A protein has these predicted regions:
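Interfacial segments of multi-pass membrane proteins
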Residues: 31-38, 120-138, 144
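Transmembrane alpha-helix boundary and packing residues in multipass membrane permease domains
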Residues: 28-29, 57-61, 121, 125, ...
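Short hydrophobic alpha-helical membrane-embedded segments
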Residues: 18-21, 93-98, 139-146
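Residue-level hotspots within the lipid-embedded alpha helices of multi-pass solute transporters
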Residues: 17-18, 49-50, 109-113, 142
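Hydrophobic transmembrane alpha-helices of multi-pass small-molecule transporters
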Residues: 53, 145-150
Length: 189
């Protein structure tokens, strides 16, 4: 990919950031690997990741409901519907109605598999969260995920394998702390 013209590298970042599941979580490390300028690739990845969001919010649920009974696409559409419903239920359980904005922001903003703008938007539409509120929370979440991925990619680029292990250690500690906090909350109830 080193022989690609510079503008095509940025177009690649833009296109990858629009792909479900991969989103900017995949686009930013690619941009870093291609040696692109963070001040250019970051906004390009954000825009690419956000471009499908209004369309997903307004139409995806309807299209998925329509297609779930179709022979060729039914299984995939059903899987997408179940993922959206599951994501919506998780958000509602963890946040309640009042904290749904911040729950949606964090859900999209923490770069874990299956928690990006696509899933967050689908969950927001299943929960019937107001369009403007959803778009605002998802935008902030995408910005947060972009910052986290950019920092992580820079750390790996600078520190190599040590950076990879450092990031893995940080993630494992965060998961462990989360588990401990949940257990303490359940013990109090």
């Amino acid at each position: 990919m080193g022989s690609l013209p510079l503008f095509l590298k940025y177009i690649l970042v833009f296109l990858v950031s629009m792909v479900p599941i991969v989103e900017l979580r995949g686009a930013i490390p690619i941009a870093e690997g291609l040696g692109l300028n963070i001040f250019l690739y970051y906004p390009i990845a954000i825009i690419g990741n956000m471009l499908p969001v209004p369309i997903i919010y307004l139409f995806a649920r309807k299209v998925l409901e329509w297609g779930k009974d179709k022979k060729l696409i039914g299984k995939f559409f059903t899987w997408c519907l179940e993922k959206g419903e599951k994501g919506g239920k998780k958000l509602k359980e963890s946040a309640g109605i009042r904290g749904i904005f911040f729950a949606l922001l964090i859900f999209v903003g923490i770069p874990l598999p299956g928690t990006g703008a696509w899933t967050g938007t689908l969950a927001a539409s299943f929960l019937n969260i107001d369009f403007k509120t959803s778009i605002f929370a998802i935008t902030l979440g995408v910005l947060l995920a972009g910052i986290i991925m950019s920092l992580g990619s820079k750390i790996v680029a600078i520190l190599g394998w040590f950076g990879v292990f450092a990031i893995i250690a940080i993630i494992l500690v965060a998961i462990l702390v989360s588990i401990i906090i949940k257990k303490k909350k359940h013990a109090i109830k």
